[in-house]
Amino acid sequence: MSKNRAEKAEIIEEIGEKLNEYPIIYLTNFEGLTVAQSNDLRGRFREAGVEYQVTKNTLARLALDRIEGKDALEEFFAGPTAIAFSEDPAKPARVLQDFLEEEELGRPELKVAWIEGDMYDDPEALDTLAELKSREELIGEVIGRLLAPAQNLVGGLQGPGQRLSGLLQSLADEEEDE
């Protein structure tokens, strides 16, 4: 096996592992970005905890062939394609949306977002996906809503006791003054 072939096999294996591991996959068309813009975008993804890589479409398709359930993505591996892998559905969308707003280029454009088995290839999908709350935010909201009745109960129980304590204190103060 030649070194070139071995390197390709390694890349296919790596992409396949990521496609299998991550529930969130974004494919973008990065055509028209300068090297500086591409590096800036990579840095933003890295800061957000999103893996982002450019790979040959042929190698990505070969990796897809080894994975069940994600073969519908194959048609989107045409033209310049970059892949963003994430655990959070909103992070890649927010990075892309912020980049698009700041750079005003119209690139990179979203080809498709694969969110735990559902595909979003509509151009407006990016706005919707960017508004999604992260898993941690949703868990925090649920916990907050579960704790709210208990906090209200504690406040309700403390209220009369505090009023009674205040009344007794004012009576004691009046007796001292007399």
Swiss-Prot record:
InterPro entries: Ribosomal_uL10, Ribosomal_uL10-like_sf, Ribosomal_uL10_bac, Ribosomal_uL10_bac_type, Ribosomal_uL10_CS_bac
Domain of life: Bacteria
Keyword Ribosomal protein included in the entry's annotation: yes
UniProt-listed PROSITE patterns: RIBOSOMAL_L10
GO molecular function: large ribosomal subunit rRNA binding; structural constituent of ribosome
CDD domains attached to this UniProt entry: Ribosomal_L10
GO cellular component: large ribosomal subunit
Keyword Secreted listed: no
The entry's keywords: Ribonucleoprotein, Ribosomal protein, RNA-binding, rRNA-binding
Secretion signal span: none
A GO biological process held by the record: translation
Quaternary organization: Part of the ribosomal stalk of the 50S ribosomal subunit. The N-terminus interacts with L11 and the large rRNA to form the base of the stalk. The C-terminus forms an elongated spine to which L12 dimers bind in a sequential fashion forming a multimeric L10(L12)X complex.
Family: Belongs to the universal ribosomal protein uL10 family.
Role of this protein: Forms part of the ribosomal stalk, playing a central role in the interaction of the ribosome with GTP-bound translation factors.
Protein's name in the database: Large ribosomal subunit protein uL10
Gene: rplJ
